[in-house]
């Protein structure tokens, strides 16, 4: 097979042509690309933790964390360090190689930056890759997080530029692109994808992938989310997307961003094993592991491992901690055992 060509000049009609291929042809092409670039049976596993929940000022119509919608979600302050580290240790023990931390903010406050940087350093000391999603970042904030050792920063484009105004009005598409530019310039790896099933048209799914594939450098990780409809949000009664259209989105993402990790992200709780298997065949090679994604349900870990065994898949190996790191982690855990610390960080206002 010839080497896969990496392009940053995709036209919308080219991508729409891929979407329109007969399913067998599309899956064959996507799987062929996948096998050239990755071990087709290896899946990178991440754990996602909400480190600050609810009370977000944005108006994303899909999101239960928006302060504008009555979804019954209890807002929480920024979590205490030991609470985060306990979750990170549990994630590593369960096989996750990357720990992702998300905060429901428009953007992080300067007063919280020192704490966030320490959080990155502490999680990395466990021998895990780190990722954060905190909203928009300035160039200086991106540089600070990069200097602290943050490996990945997530900031999704959500949908196409044309449909974007039907989803969110409190930040612009350019705001999102600017944050991605700041992240890339800082030296961190970019995690960016979107959500399908929000009432968009097929051309919007093509438009989302076009925006991602035509960035100066493809995102290192591309999460593709299926909308999880939450009562109280404007999108709670939106029509379901044909699951095969979701598979097509995964497949086209794999073809036009051949070297990126394509993450089968939110919505897996409502997917059959057969649908997930099709997504893995189409090129998905990353998942979030654990019973919750920020505030929405996710398959139980045992269910995922059972599916992996049935499909012959295996997790990507994580970063091995040194003996000194392991000893330091155990010592810290022992020191904290008798403390009755608050679950929240004192300075973290809602």
Curated annotation (Swiss-Prot):
- The lineage's top-level taxon is Bacteria
The EC number of this protein is 2.8.1.6
The protein's enzyme class = transferase
Tell me which residues bind [4Fe-4S] cluster: 56, 60, 63
Q: What is this enzyme's catalytic activity, as reactions?
A: (4R,5S)-dethiobiotin + (sulfur carrier)-SH + 2 reduced [2Fe-2S]-[ferredoxin] + 2 S-adenosyl-L-methionine = (sulfur carrier)-H + biotin + 2 5'-deoxyadenosine + 2 L-methionine + 2 oxidized [2Fe-2S]-[ferredoxin]
**CDD domains, alphabetized:** Radical_SAM (cd01335)
Question: Which Gene Ontology terms cover its molecular function?
Answer: 2 iron, 2 sulfur cluster binding; 4 iron, 4 sulfur cluster binding; biotin synthase activity; iron ion binding
Give the protein family: Belongs to the radical SAM superfamily. Biotin synthase family.
State the protein's name: Biotin synthase
Q: Which gene encodes it?
A: bioB
